[in-house]
């Protein structure tokens, strides 16, 4: 479900033409390949904000089977035209009414999904980069794994700050031991 939300956010933030090229999904992480030019740090931040906003909204996730002929022309439903579809397709809709085809995200999908976006917990992008010409990859964490990734980042930054403070103290001691003439000679 987080992959569907990411795909929807990419359409809104990067380009409506950003189409899925492949994916890997597990319980607490995902990899999403899509066609696009580079994604800026500001765009990545907006994508995270959108996905986490939909998670916070506690949107229901509906999986319904529909006649392919009835939905194949619906531009609001993400369809992968290289794929072959049978007479009946499964539409996964995040948000909206069960039978309304009015969700935040709607895609043909046969995968496993949660019942509500709140079950994702948290979405955090781990990395984004090129994997081929015109193809980008986003790797992201969800739930407790996302929280752990953030915790590790905070710990690493705290250690960097502590080292910088120690270096400043050392320089202050060195300057205190120097005479005014020596300090001025360092400046000039």
Where are these regions (language model features)?
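Active/ligand-binding-proximal structured segments within catalytic/core domains
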Residues: 1-34, 135
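Generic, well-ordered alpha-helical scaffold segments in large soluble proteins
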Residues: 5-13, 46-57, 141, 145, ...
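Histidine-centered divalent metal-coordination motifs
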Residues: 4-7, 113, 188
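Non-catalytic interaction/regulatory segments
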Residues: 34-131
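Generic recognition of long tandem-repeat/solenoid scaffolds
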Residues: 32, 92, 138-140
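Terminal appendage regions of diverse proteins
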Residues: 17-19, 27, 117-122, 126-187
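Ordered, soluble secondary-structure elements with a strong preference for glycine-centered loop motifs
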Residues: 1, 38-45, 148-155
